[in-house]
């Protein structure tokens, strides 16, 4: 067990060391530039497939996005939605703690696109005064934003198509 903890700590340290190389300077949709601030309406289950659904609505014009997500991702989003605080940090809590310890902040998340039934998102971080963009699954980005109180935005491209229920083992 101790070996796993040391290995996990090593992977985390390596990820932090490589963060500046992996992140890229901010580009793409900025807040207000063809984006819409979203509110999380909640989670539901698709009656046909039994797959969890994440429901979001644009604050400006009330357009909605529905995302099929996995049960683990739904749980990660449900925890902050219900105001729960687990006794020990979960993965998203840990990631935010690491960001904060390195004097960073999650500024916003942007759902950037939907292609071939898969939504795409970016985390926009303030890394010691430099704005950085990290690619993210939308469910992870939203779970982080809800914990941080960061805005959730969606680019116009995310509204273009409607998603289909994922096939067994499908993608978000």
Residue ranges and their predicted role:
Residues 9-19:
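Bacterial N-terminal signal peptides
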Residues 22-23:
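Signal peptide cleavage region of secreted peptide precursors
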Residues 26-71, 75-142, 146-172:
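Divalent-cation
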Residues 1-11:
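Bacterial N-terminal signal peptides that target proteins for export
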């Amino acid at each position: 067990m101790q070996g796993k903890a040391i290995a996990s700590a090593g992977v985390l340290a390596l990820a932090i060391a490589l963060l500046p190389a992996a992140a890229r300077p901010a580009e793409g949709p900025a807040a207000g530039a063809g984006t819409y601030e979203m509110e999380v309406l909640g989670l539901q289950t698709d009656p046909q497939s039994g797959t969890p659904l994440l429901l979001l609505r644009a604050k400006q014009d009330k357009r909605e996005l529905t995302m099929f997500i996995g049960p683990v991702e739904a749980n990660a989003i449900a925890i902050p939605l219900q105001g729960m605080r687990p006794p020990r940090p979960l993965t998203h809590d840990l990631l935010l703690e690491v960001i904060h310890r390195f004097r960073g902040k999650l500024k916003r998340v942007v759902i950037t696109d939907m292609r071939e039934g898969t939504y795409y998102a970016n985390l926009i971080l303030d890394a010691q005064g430099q704005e950085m963009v990290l690619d993210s699954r939308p469910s992870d980005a939203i779970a982080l934003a809800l914990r941080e109180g960061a805005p959730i935005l969606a680019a116009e491209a995310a509204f273009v198509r409607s998603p289909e229920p994922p096939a067994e083992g499908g993608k978000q």
